[in-house]
Amino acid sequence: MMNNYNRVYAKIDLDAIQNNLYAIQALLSPSTRIIAVVKADGYGHGAVPIACSIQDEDCLAGFAVATAEEALELRENGITKPILILGCVFAEHYPMLIAQKIRPTVFTLETAMQLSQAAREQQQKIPVHIKIDTGMSRIGMPADAASIELIRQIASLPQIVTEGMFTHFA
């Protein structure tokens, strides 16, 4: 006996995504704003259409992606809200990140110093987010007392605006 199977597909309801955004917001303090994580093409559901459908929502602070390429794709498709790169960034991307006002993740003084210099060359400031490793052992500075001094050094660099800090729970 032969089985004929139809191809599987996911139909994404952009109105439902918008409704879900507000359902989450209703559980939070009214002043809390959300960052929508749309990395890996929105986990295969279409980062660009999802981002375009919700970018004007008041409760949305911005978007997060995994790579510089994903961030640039959002910018090239009209996304104007802040974009945070959750993964590593590389020196060849620094000028583009600064010009496009994309927020990189920082967890070493060396990277922060390079970003500060690149921003100075463009006469700009660059907002960054500090990544703390709480057990995933991928990227981030250790969650220990020694990292406090490192964070202070990063925050004191010219052109660097320490906008936030995050972790990925293990």
Can you say where each PLM-predicted feature lies in the sequence?
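Active-site-proximal beta-alpha core segment in soluble small-molecule metabolic enzymes
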Residues: 4, 8-11, 16, 30-170
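Glycine-rich phosphate/diphosphate-binding loops that line cofactor/substrate pockets in enzymes
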Residues: 21-32
